[in-house]
Amino acid sequence: MKSNTIRHRVRASAARWLVPYLPYPHFMCVAPLDAVLRVLWRAEGQFPPAYWPRLVLLLLLSGINTIASLPERLILAAWLRLRPPRMERDNAPVFVLGYFRSGTTFLQNLLAADPSLRSPSWPQVLAPQTFVLGWALLRTLFVPLLPLTRLDAVVPVGARLPAEDDFALNNLGGMSILAGRAVLPRRQAFFNRYHNLDALSADELSRWRSHQFAFVQKLTLVAGGRRLLLKSPSHTARVRTLLELFPGAKFVHISRSPEAVFRSNIFLVRELQRAFALQSPLPEDEQEEIITRDYLATEMHYLADRARIPAADFAEVRLQDLIADPMGEMKRIYRELDLPFSRGCEERMLQVAATFGKQLRNRHPDLTEGQKARVARLEPLASSFGDARSILTVNRALGDMG
């Protein structure tokens, strides 16, 4: 009995202290070394020894992929400068907007069921320097590692599943909130500036714009004439800049009860950092305050800028309405965006809705008094989008659907 007790304690200690630092393949492992080092430089050498195995594996795999990405980075960059793909106003991207865990993944997957739309896949956003000329190598060496990256703990991941293009901006050189939120928690203040772009220097903003546009250009090469569908929660705070970069772009915003979003983001950040952080996390209260401020500021940016979007290029939906009547809401969205909606499109969307409906949903503990106070500060968002407290029970039942 005593030996069993000791064995149990050893396993519990390992789960608590060892597992978080195991060197899983990092989502930046297919980014070339120059992009990885651009992110790591911001840590100012603050890598606790417990994270060194994870750091070493990241640098090793990145070094291999640096060589693999060279042909595409040299050849395709020159090709795009000489013959950039044309993007007309009537074929500008469709952007899915909404804060993290508001239902953006569910909405993106529904839209991606439309054969006329093309979302980037996970290999494309995680290896933005390699996915055209280097696809054969990428498919052989990296795609089998996708299940090991632990991204699927927070979002559906697969070689052909729709992905967030902000991962591409991160893996092109840390131009994303993800670099702070998932990789360097102690440097969130620096990387969070790429969320709404307001505090960037002129050079930083120019670099972000050029990389965002270049990534869309590369996607256009492999889209086969289809309209691009892009989803990243950070785009919610970038509407003004996206309209400048992509005239004629269309936007669909999804909202959810602020309490449910807040709860789910606590889980999201914890799991991201558990899998990918190279530094110790911030104290819980400090991280929750960052989430609260960021969530409120993101949606306020959107509310301030949505009047700039032409009426025919803009639609909004609430997650609970999309769950209750997916086809009714999708048909309404298509009408408001003036996009064609086919019978085949409806059948594929119904399959997506059924798949997401069967997914396991997370349960979260009750809020503390401090967390309740933070949720109360988000009440303006519930009023703005009609996500009143009366629907919180429904949102808890829906769980974490993106």
Where does each model-flagged region fall?
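Post-Walker A helix-loop "phosphate-sensing" segment adjacent to the P-loop in P-loop NTPases
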Residues: 113-123
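Conserved phosphate-donor/acceptor-positioning beta-strand/loop module used by diverse small-molecule
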Residues: 231-232, 242-267
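Flexible loop/turn segments at secondary-structure boundaries
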Residues: 236-239, 259-262, 323-326
